Amino acid sequence: MTARRAPAVNRDVLERMLVDGAASLDVALSDTQRNRLLDYVALLGKWNAVYNLTAIRDPQQMLIQHILDSLSIVPHLRGRASARVLDVGSGGGLPGLVLAIVEPDWQVTLNDIVQKKSAFQTQTRAELKLTNLSVVTGRVETLRPGVEVPEKFDIIVSRAFADLSDFVKLARHLVAPGGSIWAMKGVHPDDEIARLPEGSRVKQTMRLAVPMLDAERHLIEVAVDEAI
């Protein structure tokens, strides 16, 4: 499959939504980054017709619920000149693909167990020329630094992977010293936090405000003893 741009009128509408949304999040986008994000929406819509990557079909809702939702975490993750990032259960590439676009100095790895999703991620990487992005297929708990992945990660993030306690249990062996696990959630996950495994703790909880989306969003940062 090759990238297909959305019809001009639709792309213009999406571009205005993206520009306004990114500005409200205090995320500056270059022309290249903006165009890559819009091309990503077009690719996601095209592949979704065949591979069912997301339940959201409308391009404007894709932009809000996928792109802007992913961009909303960027200000909280920044502060590193470079970072190694693992996106667990990435699906259609969220949020990792968005992070790779807006943070070109970060090395981002997308992980999923479904081959067709990895195929979409790989194709999107090629079409958008994201040299800082890699894709690995398999269960996160089986990934080994120096084997399936090059090394441990400073940031391990997930948007829709699992219960927080399960996420921490499965991914904690991949956290680099000084690194953290970051979970994107809807309503504040009090019950999930209460079930966090021994040797892990919440460092901070942030309420996210996603432009044009009337829904609760939270970002939870978890530290694990292995990364101290």
From Swiss-Prot:
It comes from the Bacteria. Signal peptide: none annotated. The keyword S-adenosyl-L-methionine applies. Keywords: Cytoplasm, Methyltransferase, rRNA processing, S-adenosyl-L-methionine, Transferase. Gene3D superfamilies: Vaccinia Virus protein VP39. The keyword Transferase applies. GO terms for molecular function: rRNA (guanine-N7-)-methyltransferase activity. S-adenosyl-L-methionine binds at G89, L94, V140, E141, R159. Belongs to the methyltransferase superfamily. RNA methyltransferase RsmG family. Specifically methylates the N7 position of guanine in position 527 of 16S rRNA. This is Ribosomal RNA small subunit methyltransferase G. It comes from Burkholderia multivorans (strain ATCC 17616 / 249).
